Amino acid sequence: MAGSSWPVRLSHQAVTLRPLRRRDEAEWAAIRRRSGNWFRPWDSTRPPGAAEPGMTFGQLVSAFSGRARRGLMLPWAVDYTPPGGRPVFAGQVTVSGITHGSACWAQVGYWIDPRWAGRGIIPTAVAMAADYCFDTLDLHRIEIAIRPENTNSLAVVRKLGARYEGRRERYMHVDGAWRDHDVFVLEAEERPGAVMERLERRLHAPEQG
C-alpha cells in the first residue's frame, strides 16, 4: 500500500479539493437551507430505530478528520474559483469505506451547490479523488451508488466513463425510505491513463450527429 497522510489538498484548474473545516459550517448551512428541495430526494436519512445519535457539524468534522487520519476516509470540501473571482465553497466529495488487503476499494459520494451545477465541477472533483485513490492509495476499485431517478448524478458518472454494474434493491435509506441504487464502478485496470485524462477527452470530444 502506498503511503498517504491527511490532510490532503488537490487542485485542477478552477477546482480544489481540501479538507472539510469547522468554519465551513455557515456556508454549508446556508447552501442546505437555500436549496433544501434540491437535496432532499437524494440525502441519506436515518432509518427508524437507528441507535447512533445525530451529530453537530463540528462533531461531524471532528469525526471525519479522525477517520481520515486513520486512513478510513477522505472528507473533502470542493472549492470553485469562478472566472475573475475568489474561491467559494461549492460542495463536497467524500471517499468512504476505504479498504485495503484483498479488496482495495472505496465508495465515493458527492453533492454540489445548485448555483454552480453544470460547470463540470463535480466530475472534475471526483476524477481528482479517483486518481488519488488509484495512484497514491493503491486502490483497485471505486464504487458510486446513485438513485436511478437522479439524472444529474447519472450525468457525472457518464462523463467519468464509469461502468454500470447493476442495481441494488433497498440499498440505502434516503429521503425517508430504503431506496434502490444503481452502482457504477471505476477500476484501476480499466482506465487508459488517469481518470482526469478520460474526463477531459469526453468533455472536449466533438458532438456526434
Task: Go through the PLM ranges and name each one.
Residues 1-27, 31-38, 75-209:
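Acyl-donor (CoA/ACP) binding surface of acyl/acetyltransferases
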Residues 31, 42, 60-63, 67, ...:
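Residues that form generic nucleotide/phosphate-binding pockets
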Residues 38-62:
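Conserved GNAT-fold acetyl-CoA-binding loop/helix
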Residues 48-50, 61-77:
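A short helix-loop-beta-strand connector motif used in the catalytic cores of GNAT acetyltransferases and
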Residues 56-60, 64, 68, 154, ...:
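Solvent-exposed, well-ordered amphipathic alpha-helical segments
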